[in-house]
Amino acid sequence: MLKKLLSLVSLWIPLFLYAQGVTISGYTYDGLTQKGLANCRVSIKTSTMDTLLAQVTTVLQTERTEENGNVFVYQNTQIGALFMLQFNAPISAQAYHLVIEKEGYESIEKIISAKSLQKERLDLGDFYLFPKRKDKILGEAVVKATKIKMYYKGDTLVYNAGAFNVSQMDKLKSLVAQLPGTELKDGVLKVNGRPIENLMLSGKDFFNGNIQAALDNLPAYVVSKIKVYEKAGDMSELTGRNMHDKSYVMDVKLKREYIGTWIAKLQADGGTSRLWGSQGMLMRMDDRQMFTANFDANNLNEKREMSEMGDGADLFLAGRFKRWNAKVNYFYEPNRYWRFRTEAQVERLQSLLNEQSYQQTFFPSKDLFNRSRQQNKERQYTTNAFAAVRYRFKKQQHELQYTFRFGHHRRQSEKIALSWYDSITTQNWATISLDSLYAQEKDKSQTPLLFSLFHPTLSKQVENVHTLSLASIYTLRKNVLKTYLRYQAMTENDTHNENYILTRYTPVSPDWRRNYIKDRSQAQKAEMRAEYIWKVAEKERNNGELTPYIEYKYNHGDATHSLYRLDWDSHFATYDWFSKLVDISSISDFQASCMDYNNSYNSTLTEHHSAIGTQFNFQHKTEKGNVFDIRATAETSLAHRSLAYLRGGLSHHIQCKSWLFTPNLTLKWEEGNTEDQRWLSSAQILYKGTPRLVNMLHLLPVRDDSDPNNISQGNQHLKNAWEQNLQLLYQSRHRTMQHLWLLEAQWRHVFNDFTFLSAYNSRTGHRIYTPQNTNRTHWLEGATSYAIPLGKAQKLWLTAKLSGDYYQGEILSYIDGTALSQNQLLQSLTITPQLYLTANISSKFRASVLWSTALQSVQQPQATNNYRTTRLRSDFTWQLPWDVELQSDINTLIYKGYSERSINQTAIRWNASLHKYFQLSHGTLSVGFKVYDILHQANSLQTSIDQFSRIENYTNVMPRYALLSLVYMTNWSSKKRSKE
């Protein structure tokens, strides 16, 4: 009996010593060739090296591809050789010893803590094994792995995600911002100066071309590699030939263990100043389908992440926003024939914006100044839906798409404005508060004030848009026929209520009125296009095609604009008139007496646009591998437009027929990638000519004085405009040192550009706008940058950049009684030097520092204004012991030369946060504490300058606050794991 008990105890002891089964995975590469290295022996032992827990051999991954109906199976050497160690982790072990060995290569050893194995899975990323040197004496020396950040595989740029520092809660956007050569600005993602046209996920267009959605939703820790390359389009895939339809894409490769895995995230925020937020995400992706669902509700101005390195968003977000958003996306590709995509989104946005504006209008004799304060309250509801189905059969492809949009927008605002001419008396008025200035001047018999305006408004807008399209591709031997059909129907209903209290400090009588405006419009658009791609050359070195095409567009729209006006009368109490907005629910009672027939109208616009053109594509490869690309397009079109317009009892009928010519030319050169070259260069020159049609409403001989301060009238002599755009892009990179030099330049000129002649009344301050043509509008932009890694380990990257832009516009503003000066130009020149340093010191620390100074000079005939804005930004993320993460960022803006003296100073926004991560049995919990604007100096300033005026806007911003955040992230697999 005793022997049986001892036997049972001996069987149970290992079950307690080995607590749970874990899986450790990773990839092995040849450190020189950057290819997957198979047959490496990977062993895991206890830290004392006395017990071997598991041992496997790395293997290359097998992939399938289909081309012309044939299935090819091959081993992919570009994604690394995989190893997966499965074993039971002993409770008594304090650490584990991982050894990677292969004959002829330096071995790699890595210590793994027991705490890191609390999860069921652990991905170690990529390991690069280097061949042994012949003169090295083999001993017990251990070679530590160095992760290579980036390398080129042919024309494909590959980033190793494991070599960059990302926290457990970072999104893909944070990882992409660290990649050398990438830039994310104004919603455009660029790599080496070239815009990314699409973001793929394991080679599939899961996000339907929405790059921002991919950056904001995909967790960074699931990414293995990021590849940037030119991807062949649908025509090339169907024909198996080069059809010149490549696009520049970023392809995100997931770690193998997360394919087929559900990923979920929940977040809750609460802080001072009554701030709150909640966020959730659910996602799953495999080889055939992807599902994502997320929601977000917060009043944090949508600035939810602590610090995203390289983020180009505004430093100080204006206004206060509350946002509720929910979105579902599904992609399914069951086989090579069918593909389904669908997306639905519902959003509610509520905002409060307090804005102060300072405007200086340029005149030859004296300038006009205007100061205003305005509060805007808005509520928006939008619903967007999208569905698409694609079918491929043999040599055909058809894709049907449907989109729907519903929007409801309500806006209420209150505005007060003062206006005066420049004089000695008014020199200091920019520094006096608006209310004090009004109280000081309103009762004076002699005041420099020109007028004051109180203007509360209430508007509502409802719109519906339906769009249906069908795109088809037919392959005819070596050639391709493409067709495209599209139909769109849109309706919009607007209502607008306003009190308009205009007081003039001149002998002219004041203008006090109430307006009610009702707009109804509907439009239908149809489009048809057919093109035939004819292969004229198909050789290894010469490949070309000629594409004749025809296109037809139809547009028909009806609009009704009804204006009801009620002038002030003595029986209205002044208090009610000033403070209460008119809310006319039924206009039938006074429709006949209040209708403003002179400013109400009905219009019907019909457009027919027919085009015929030819596109020529040709590619030539030299013996040395240099590539020359030519793409030329010539299009001739006829635009026939008619406008029926009824206003003030008068009927107008206008017809315009315009012959248009649209040329495009792109020349591209890429240097061949040969072993004897140190530098690889490429250049691109693009010219584009675009005709711009005149607005038919501007041709009408009518006068609109519904706004007594801004009167507009038509010009029957307006001509069509012609825009020319010339761009140059040159880049050169060093093969081994990874230095990158970029040069960009762009020139734009508009012949017969559309602008407005502004005539100001010196007594009343009202202005009359008349559309005009001008030939003196020019833009010139340029930038050059040089990026280098500091050190062989590429832990530091420095980018130096110098950019400049020049704008020239003709001044067409004058005061009545003075002649319009000829050849008066406004010229604006801005030069901006910039330095940007990023650092990934280790897997625990990353940081970035940016400095830039924008030097702007604005010249007009009587004055020259100089502005300077210096921007300093630094941030870091430091992963401390005990799973604690510290983040901080400091953003500094230094203003000089602005009218408001209070702005000409230094504004610093300093944020900091601390996160503690808890590894739970089924996920990760993060507890974070964040302090925003520690020094309480954040502000918002926006400026704009053109040939008419200079405008400075100052808006309210987020207050200083402290925020507590709880984030829980987990993942689980729906696959059944086999026991081995």
Locations of regions flagged by a protein language model:
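A short, solvent-exposed loop/turn motif at the edges and junctions
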Residues: 78-112
